[in-house]
Regions:
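Conserved C-terminal portion of the radical SAM core fold
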Residues: 1-25, 35-64, 71, 76, ...
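Short acidic, glycine/proline-rich loop/turn micro-motifs
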Residues: 25-29, 91
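Short, contiguous strand/loop micro-motifs
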Residues: 29-30, 51-53, 98-100
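Alpha-helix N-cap and loop-to-helix initiation/capping positions
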Residues: 30-38, 104
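Radical SAM enzyme core and accessory elements
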Residues: 67, 72-75, 81-219
């Protein structure tokens, strides 16, 4: 509140890392290391304090912990992460002292997406706001009022559909396509729904990089 009042800025996303095992790091060496219970409370308090802000959690947390914080308000998670230098270019060896932290959730991206679909979540790969310059006060005014959801829902479905067509396993693709059909009904703006369906069909025909960018009506 002070930052907004004094500087006109506020949090766009908040990350919730904590000390976790890594090369040469033993969490037992830290007397004030945060337990799972306290960690979950911190996530819940942040979500209540800033309900409009994206919250991020990485693969340093276990699958069980990530499942819990998704229920408490985390909105962005990673999957299939590589934490060492060049990790995405080359397979990581068993002993790699360049790792930033030990990955606790070792599932592949496809497995994470499949898991999210099973939980009824929409795995979104959207970056439309950044690419359209919908940032700063322009973004915050929409996020605080919840109006940003009118762009998020179509864009989430579009980016998910592109992922499903290009990278997903057959099981994940089947679940994802079914979820897209269901979630289309939650787009209440007829024009937005029509545009989303048009773009979804174009993606299935092999076209790429669609995003819904129309500014939201304040009515």
């Amino acid at each position: 509140e002070h930052l907004e009042a004094a500087q006109g800025v506020g949090p766009h996303t908040i990350s919730v890392p904590r000390i976790c095992p890594a090369d040469d790091i033993d969490t037992d060496d830290f007397s004030n290391a945060i337990s799972d219970e306290i960690f979950h409370k911190i996530v819940a308090v942040i979500r209540i304090a800033v309900p409009y802000t994206g919250m991020i959690i990485s693969t340093r947390e276990s699958q069980k912990s990530r499942e819990k914080v998704l229920e408490l308000g985390v909105s962005q998670i990673s999957g299939g992460s590589k934490t060492s230098v060049g990790g995405y270019a080359e397979p990581e060896p068993e002993e790699d002292n360049s790792a930033q932290f030990d990955v606790s959730d070792t599932r592949t991206l496809d497995q994470v997406v499949n898991w999210l679909l099973d939980g009824g979540f929409i795995p979104s790969f959207c970056t439309a706001c950044y690419r359209e310059g919908r940032t700063g006060d322009r973004f915050m005014s929409l996020a605080k009022t919840g109006q940003i959801a009118n762009c998020c829902q179509p864009n989430a479905l579009l980016t998910l559909n592109e992922y499903l067509d290009d990278y997903a396993s057959e099981d994940t693709r089947k679940k994802g396509k079914a979820l897209i059909e269901r979630e289309l009904e939650n787009i209440t703006n007829p024009k937005a729904k029509e545009t989303c369906i048009k773009y979804l069909n174009a993606i299935d025909e092999g076209k790429r990089d669609f995003r819904y960018v129309k500014e939201i009506s304040r009515e």
